[in-house]
Structure formats: C-alpha cells, structure tokens
C-alpha cells in the first residue's frame, strides 16, 4: 500500500519560517494532492501485491505498511504534524500519555540503572518509577524542582535519565529547562520533559536542551476531552529506539484517535491563547480572596517562577491551582458548588474542569510522596476552557462565597 497523503514538499526550506498557527494547521505537508482531511485508515493489517513488495517493506520503504501496531498511515501523518509543532526531527504517537512515558523510559534504561525525577510530578509517572520499574531493578530518586539546576551534583554512577515537568502538575512550579538540561548533560543524563501543561505553542523544550519531549495527547493537543493518546518527539535516533520499544510493549495509537488529534491540532493556536487569557483573568481576580490561601499561576508576578516562565514560555498556560484556607473539607465543598466547571479529571479541553489532586492525579500516593510533591489537601486544580471569562470567574466566586 503506497502513501495516500502526498509527499512532504518543502523546496528551499520555507516551512522553517512559518508561524506556529500555520504549522499546526498544515504540519509538514505542502501542496499535496488528494483529500484535504486526513483519511482514517482503520485496519489492523495491510496486504502486499507481491513478495517483491514485501521485500521492499522489509528493506525500509516507508510508503509500505505491514501491521498497525508497527505503523499506520493516519498515525504517521499525526507523527509528522507533532514533529513539526515541536520543532523535532521525528515523533511517535502512542495509546496514552503514560504509554509515552513508559515507552520512553523503558527504551533508555536497564536493570541496575537509576532514574532521577522532579519531586513535583504527575502521580502516574511517580507510580511508574516507584511501583513498576523497581520490579525490574530500575531505581528512582526524586529531587525538589528548585534543586534540579544542580542535578550534576545529585547524579550518581547509575543515573541514566532525568524526568521533569514544567509547569509541574498540579503545583505549577516552573523549571529552568535550559539550566537543568545543561547540568544533566554534564553527567550524561538523557532529559525527558513532559510538555503537556505548556503545549508546544507556549514552550519548546527541545530548543532549550531536552532530549525527548513527552505529551499526553488527551489534553490540549486534542483539546476536546474525547480521546486518549500520548506522544514523544525528539531526534530521529531516539524516536527510533522508542518506536522499537513501543512495538514490543504494544501501546500503539488507534487510527481514529490519531485523526481526532490531527483535527484538534488545527485549532491549537486559537484555543490555547484563550485558555491563557481566562487563566490569568481568574488568577488575578482570586489573588487576595479571603477563602483562598494561595493562587498558583506562573503568570502572576507573585509566583516564584514568574521570571523563568517569562523567559522560556510565550504564554503562562491554562491551568490555575488554588489552595483553600479550609483544607480538604473546604476544597470538597467548593468542588461540589461549582456549576460551569465540570467535576472531572484531565485538562486542556475546551470545557473548564475542576479536580482535587488528592482524589485524582495523586490519589493513593503515600503521605511522604504527597509532601515531596507539594500536594496540599486543600488544593483544587482548575483547567480553564474557552468559555467567557466573566462566567468562569462568577462560577468560582459563587462556589467560594460560603467559605
């Protein structure tokens, strides 16, 4: 089966100068003849015309396909688009964000190795590092985000990988990625940056020195809370290693989900700025509210990472975390009184969502890990959608009114 989408055509390298919105809409395709919307190739396997054609596939002809777990035309189109928006040589799309993180780490470590990570990290990643990988002889150590720039002092002889998020989930700490990557590379560490909260529209970790960028496609890149997916982007050689691991682990992305992510990418540059505007508007309104002990948002000058965020990001993101003065009971009462914000896990979609980290992203983690991650029982994580800002503020203020 040949390529049905048209070849990538970029005479003179003109795409290198295109803006992020144009890149999100067009990916790396230019002047391709054929369907404007990417076809969904919903099949498990592909037929060959002859033994000679199969030999061409085995010799590396990328216009031929064998089995969707290995590669699929719709998924490959998404991978090209993801590489374009991240400024990467290549990308790999997989079944979920956790499939992406697991694939990346497993492709880089073996028994006896150690993974270093920020203490403020998504709960699923923490469980991967503390519950699953130790069964196979891979250790993990967690360091405060503020200490990561000195990772060269913390790394040991067994250390192989560093995992960071910026902004972090859900505390919204900002990591100086350029400084951290330089320090990590001084000790030979491979740096994986979870860029889910920032999106490639606001932050380009590869340009700041990261080796691999990871995304939960479920979130802002797809943008509509209707699919689950994940991705890695980076140098071609590292993505090839991750792809070989994915083929064994089996976490391939469904072609229909790939189509939906492609559609979501086309409006990324329209959705994310609106979410950033809504988040900043809400954060400013709530700073100083008597029922709110802290407002965590990198766009506020009071945020400790504000200056770093201004330097390495083009916007501050659509996530705001509140720490309520009354602890978990107050957070649960506030949560129950919300009307516009959906009470749901996940983030980054067009609809605004509210979650309690101790009950969702970090549920079940031991107390010491919660403390290390800076998780307060009174935290409420808000994912701002694209609704009218005044309506969102009114909803939050009415939910806080009784506190």
Regions found by a protein language model. Name each.
Residues 63, 89, 228, 257, ...:
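Short amphipathic alpha-helical segments
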Residues 15, 24-29, 90-289, 296, ...:
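Conserved PLP-enzyme active-site core in the AAT-like
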Residues 32, 47-51, 239-240, 327-330, ...:
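Short, acidic Gly/Pro/Ser/Thr-rich loop/turn segments
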Residues 85, 286-290, 338:
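Acidic-histidine catalytic/liganding microenvironments
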Residues 2-72, 80:
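N-terminal "arm"/small-domain region of PLP-dependent enzymes with the aminotransferase-like
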Residues 50-99, 124-131:
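Conserved N-terminal alpha-helix of the aminotransferase class I/II PLP-enzyme fold
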């Amino acid at each position: 089966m040949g390529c049905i989408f048209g070849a990538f055509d970029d005479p003179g390298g003109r795409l290198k100068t295109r803006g992020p919105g144009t890149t999100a809409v067009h990916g790396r395709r230019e002047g391709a003849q054929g369907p404007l919307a990417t076809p969904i190739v919903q099949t498990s396997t592909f037929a060959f015309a002859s033994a000679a054609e199969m030999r061409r596939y085995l010799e590396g002809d990328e216009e031929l396909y064998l089995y969707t777990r290995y590669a699929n035309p719709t998924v490959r189109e998404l991978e090209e688009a993801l590489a374009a928006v991240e400024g990467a040589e290549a990308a790999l799309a997989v079944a979920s964000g956790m499939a992406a993180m697991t694939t990346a780490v497993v492709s880089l470590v073996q028994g006896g190795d150690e993974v270093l990570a920020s203490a403020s990290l998504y709960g699923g990643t923490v469980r991967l590092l503390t519950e699953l990988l130790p069964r196979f002889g891979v250790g993990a150590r967690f360091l405060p985000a503020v200490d990561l720039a000195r990772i060269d002092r913390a790394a040991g002889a067994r250390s192989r990988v560093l995992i960071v998020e910026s902004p972090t989930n859900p505390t919204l700490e900002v990591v100086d990625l350029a400084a951290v990557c330089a320090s990590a590379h001084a000790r030979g560490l491979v740096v994986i940056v979870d860029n889910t909260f920032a999106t490639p529209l606001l932050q380009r970790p590869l340009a700041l020195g990261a080796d691999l960028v990871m995304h939960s496609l479920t979130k802002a890149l797809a943008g509509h809370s209707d699919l689950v997916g994940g991705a890695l982007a980076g140098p071609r050689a590292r993505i090839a290693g991750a792809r070989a691991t994915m083929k064994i682990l089996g976490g391939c992305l469904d072609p229909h989900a790939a189509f939906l992510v492609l559609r979501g990418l086309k409006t990324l540059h329209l959705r994310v700025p609106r979410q950033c505007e809504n988040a900043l508007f809400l954060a400013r309104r709530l700073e100083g509210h008597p029922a709110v002990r802290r407002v965590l948002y990198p766009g506020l000058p009071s945020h400790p990472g504000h200056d770093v965020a201004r330097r390495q990001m083009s916007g501050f993101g659509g996530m705001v975390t509140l720490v309520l003065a009354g602890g978990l009971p107050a957070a649960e009462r506030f949560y129950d009184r919300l009307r516009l914000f959906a009470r749901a896990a996940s983030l980054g979609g067009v609809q605004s969502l509210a979650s309690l980290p101790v009950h969702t992203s970090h549920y079940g983690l031991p107390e010491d890990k919660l403390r290390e991650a800076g998780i307060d029982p009174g935290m409420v994580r808000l994912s701002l959608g694209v609704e009218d800002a005044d309506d969102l503020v009114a909803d939050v203020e009415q939910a806080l009114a009784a506190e």
